[in-house]
Amino acid sequence: MLLALPFLFLLNLRLNKKLKFTVNDSKTIFFAALASLAFTTDLTLWHYSMNITSVSNATIIVNSSPVFVAILGYIFFREKLSRSFVVSFLITYIGILGLIYFSNNYLNGKLLGDILCLIAAFFYGVYLLVIAKLGKENSLNIIFYTTFFCCLFSIIPMMIEGGNLIPSSSFEWLNLILMAFLCQFGGQYFITHAIGKISAPGASIGLLMQPLTATILAAIIFSEILTTLQIVFALISLFGIYLARINLNQ
């Protein structure tokens, strides 16, 4: 997160001809901090879960967050849950439960990883819901302040984890810089900027590239080959997530 800040400053200087990030409403700072707390919790649980469960399980389960966005929107903002959402909810979690069951994670002690992913999906849903309420704010301002507060909140899990907090090799530094540039600066900024400018189906299909890409790369890099039944339930889950995102963006 910290390494992404210089890129954001440079982009702000390029687009707005200034270094200062000026918000339209003072409440934006508070909501950015709240969103950052949820996002930091999501990332902490998600990264920890990948040491326990598979990359494909972790990514697909965490991407069920639109379901939590809709449920939380109903609870806190009385946003109606449509019949199509209920269908997407059922399809998504039939797929997820099937994926977990046929991964045999409940037998080999990896079920905890899948449970952590579900909790992470909830917190990512909180993050998305809060960010959605900042729709009138400039997307670059939102990303800057959420990134800044994530830096602060990340100190807590970092201190708990302990160990060497500074990268010890140029390879580790390169990985961190690429993550900062590609994931936080590039990914989060363009998602926030583009999500309201393209159609709901287009946004849903685009965001589904994350779990699909992660599953393919996990098979290539980590030899996490899915069985036929796992692939079937993964596709069912992705279809449910696709429907949920269409419902969420309408």
What label would you give each PLM region?
Residues S36, T40, T44, V67-I71, ...:
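Hydrophobic/small/kink-forming positions within alpha-helical transmembrane segments
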Residues S49, I61, I75-F77, L81, ...:
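Hydrophobic/aromatic residues within transmembrane alpha-helices
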Residues L2-F7, I61-I75, L90-I91, F149-F153, ...:
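Alpha-helical transmembrane segments of compact multi-pass small-molecule transporters, enriched
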Residues V23-T28, Y101-F123, M159-L178, I225-A234:
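Juxtamembrane helix-entry segments on the extracytoplasmic side of multipass membrane proteins
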Residues L8, L72, L81-S103, A120-A121, ...:
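Hydrophobic transmembrane alpha-helices of multi-pass small-molecule transport proteins
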Residues A58-S64, I131-C151, Q184-I220:
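Helix-helix packing/entry segments at the starts of transmembrane helices
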Residues M1-T41, F68, F123-Y127, F144-G162, ...:
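Transmembrane alpha-helices of multi-pass small-molecule transport proteins
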Residues L13-S56, V62, G98, A180-I198:
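Specific transmembrane alpha-helical segments of multi-pass solute transporters/efflux pumps
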